[in-house]
Swiss-Prot record:
The keyword Protein biosynthesis does not apply. It comes from Haemophilus influenzae (strain PittGG). This is Cell division protein ZipA. GO terms for biological process: division septum assembly; FtsZ-dependent cytokinesis. It is found in: Cell inner membrane. The chain crosses the membrane at residues 5-25.
Amino acid sequence: MDLNTILIIVGIVALVALIVHGLWSNRREKSKYFDKANKFDRTSLTSRSHTQEEMVQPNNISPNTYVENGHTPISQPTTEKLPSEAELIDYRQSDKSVDDIKISIPNTQPIYDMGNHRSEPIQPTQPQYDMPTANNVASMTLEQLEAQSQNVGFNGINSSSPELRVQLAELSHEEHQVDYNLSFNEPKAETTAQPKQTTGYIQLYLIPKSSEEFNGAKLVQALENLGFILGKDEMYHRHLDLSVASPVLFSVANLEQPGTFNAYNLAEFNTIGIVLFMQLPSPGNNLANLRMMMRAAHTLAEDLQGVILTEEQEIFDANAEQAYLARV
């Protein structure tokens, strides 16, 4: 028999031995498991039923639940879970056991006995405040209250007192109260509205800024650009429809006597100033016509480097303009 055959036989024998050993070990472990399971059912359940039968009797377990041989329990469907051992404690003994408890620290004497102090409930003690009376607080100033709060220390002032709150609020209200009882019966300066001007003339003056005079040719050109037409009484007029046939809104006259413009000598004409005037009542709306005359005066002042004056020969500023508009 050669070496290869011997090795094959030895390997097969070893393999068979391993298989047999594994099966035997598996059966032994399984037998031990089932042995422990049967022993647990037999001892734990039976001992529990004997020790707890005086305390609680399960509703769904009958005395004939187990067979006489005691090997296999007969299981029956139950709707309620069996109470655990923690739930089966006799709570009637809890008060007595609590009384016997003593709390102590190692190497020291017991410092508290639950049984001796059980019948004596601890009464909460309320701190005593050295409070000033409400009348005194009400009469104090803010500085005195702050000093009092510092002197009382940790306890402070009991601001939760309703009476104290009311009196402090009244005191603060009296200190900060402002007398709003104004007398409305006092005579007031009556602002009488200025009566509207319905007749007469409204005038504006335009003069040069320097001592020079207005050049006639430039003046005529500026007037014609604004729609003025030389017409009646040898004056320039601003008509409603820019035609001689339409009504005159306002006019321009020469400040030099006789106040006319020489139509035949305009090239050599010079003047110290002109006056714009509007006769009331004017055609259409007096206020609209006055605004138009004011705009014409401002345009002429820019073109001719002039200054606008009021009827009182004062500078025609924004206030004077509002006063003119208020007249109509």
